[in-house]
Amino acid sequence: MVRPLRRRGRLIVDRSAALIGLLAGDQAEDRAVLAGEPAYVALRARDRARREAVMKMLADGWPEDADALYAAAWILNHGDLSEEAALGSRLATRAAELGRPGARWLAAAALDRSLMYAELPQKYGTNIVPDGVGWRLWDVDPATTDQERIANDVPPLAEMQARAAAITKPQPDMAGAPDSLRRAMRRWGTLPPA
């Protein structure tokens, strides 16, 4: 449910500026760090602090401007929970309705992340994960068409699969992988013996 702030004026402007500032901090992060490394642990702590700040601001209602909605959605998409990503998808959908460039893709990506965290197939195929051997798309719902992807600013499935196959980054230490990823690796046949 969309609950815009009932109050007008400085509070709304300050909150929008704060959300956009949090997004700038998020986008300035070096995300090319391997899971389990100290730099990754520190990154996730900063991500968590930004999400907590966003949730406090959203407690008074959703922002009314597209850029602030987009900023909040982007930060929640870096969450650890399906519910955070699902809220990010709804915020991005509203930002798209208001005409924010990039918001349709973000709504799709956040929905996919929410589904992935719930151990369900993605709708669009935006999440690429390590599988202990290489990089792959998290499972994708075969009923979703490339036309649906394109309508949401997501590349066709074959292009996303090629992107995953082209990644040559080292695999993170899978000993600390989330249980959901370890179960998926078992399903994919890539989980190394214990």
Which residue ranges define each predicted feature?
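Amphipathic alpha-helical repeat scaffolds of TPR domains
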Residues: 9-37, 64-78, 102-118
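Helix-turn-helix repeat elements of alpha-solenoid scaffolds
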Residues: 41-53, 82-85
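Alpha-helical solenoid scaffolds that mediate protein-protein interactions
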Residues: 54-57, 61, 95
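Terminal, low-structured helical/coil segments at or just beyond the last alpha-helical repeat
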Residues: 65, 110-194
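Conserved positions within tetratricopeptide repeat
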Residues: 66, 82-89, 104-105, 158
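Alpha-helix C-terminal capping/termination sites
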Residues: 77-81, 151
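TPR/TPR-like (Sel1-like) alpha-helical repeat modules
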Residues: 86-101, 128-129
